[in-house]
Amino acid sequence: MCERAARLCRAGAHRLLREPPQQGRALGGLLRWVGARMGEPRESLAPAAPADPGPASPRGGTAVILDIFRRADKNDDGKLSLEEFQLFFADGVLNEKELEDLFHTIDSDNTNHVDTKELCDYFVDHMGDYEDVLASLETLNHSVLKAMGYTKKVYEGGSNVDQFVTRFLLKETANQIQSLLSSVESAVEAIEEQTSQLRQNHIKPSHSAAQTWCGSPTPASAPNHKLMAMEQGKTLPSATEDAKEEGLEAQISRLAELIGRLESKALWFDLQQRLSDEDGTNMHLQLVRQEMAVCPEQLSEFLDSLRQYLRGTTGVRNCFHITAVRLSDGFTFVIYEFWETEEAWKRHLQSPLCKAFRHVKVDTLSQPEALSRILVPAAWCTVGRD
């Protein structure tokens, strides 16, 4: 019995010596796990860098600014010179020096020209709430073009009812857009009026020259008549009716003679002339001359815009007279405008009518227009009473 117990004790001891201890097996497994994990790629403990967002999407309204650049870039060289910049952005408020300073402000890389990026960057930084407006204009333009295509499709193959609905929606769209446009134009007119008043506070207004022309105060709405002066056998059709009053015909005749002298470079003073004004012999009119060379392929568009400009300017109270002359080459036009004062002409430059014509000129002229101004005696436009 004791011997058997001794054998079992020896066998158990040998078995324990042959088997690794449990703690050793656990430690080996832990070491193998640690080794395996160390061989795996490990993630950095630092915060992950944000993914590259790619190029930033253009700000709203950029397409409109690019269109402005295209119209201002007269020679299509992809950049605006100072002359092109002043021609396009002149509004009658900023003078040439102020426009030049603005040009160099926008020209951030000091290359003496403004490229598309510089123009977009400047206006985008100053757009404010107009960013949404200009972005909406981009969307509206696309939507209107799409709707015009739909309208054409309906009118080619739609039923009478479909055509009625489309016609109604088209008219309503026009009414809504016109309503918005009227609101914007009212704001433009209010700002222009306020700007004119601010400028007049710094400039003493001159006495009205209208009394010099007519010898009586100006009526509430002074009529203006357009003269299409003949030059080398060519003329531009008049947009208004011929003057019927004898006194007005005399004025037109004298203006025709004056313009003929201007074109022939034979301007002189009649020293024997009796001036009809008694105390205003020093009164002058502002005569503005614009000479424009039109691209042949854009002639029709230019003529349409010119006629609208002449009709609109004729109704401006402070414009005594306006005339347009077509030169012998058929593509060069000269406009003469007689204004009561320089300030009246500058206010006119801010009007929607003048800005619309200026934009058409940018698109249709083959080179920047030549503009000059001189003062002419108001007595030249006075009906003689001798």
UniProtKB/Swiss-Prot annotation:
Any one annotated GO CC term: axon
Residues that bind Ca(2+) 2: D107, D109, T111, H113, E118
Modification sites for Asymmetric dimethylarginine: R42
GO terms assigned for molecular function: A2A adenosine receptor binding; calcium ion binding; identical protein binding; type 5 metabotropic glutamate receptor binding
Keyword annotations from UniProtKB, A to Z: Calcium, Cell membrane, Cell projection, Coiled coil, Cytoplasm, Membrane, Metal-binding, Methylation, Repeat
Record: residues binding Ca(2+) 1: D73, N75, D77, K79, E84
PTM-bearing positions, type Omega-N-methylarginine: R10
ABM domain ranges (all copies): 286-375
Protein name, UniProt field: N-terminal EF-hand calcium-binding protein 2
Source organism of this protein record: Homo sapiens (Human)
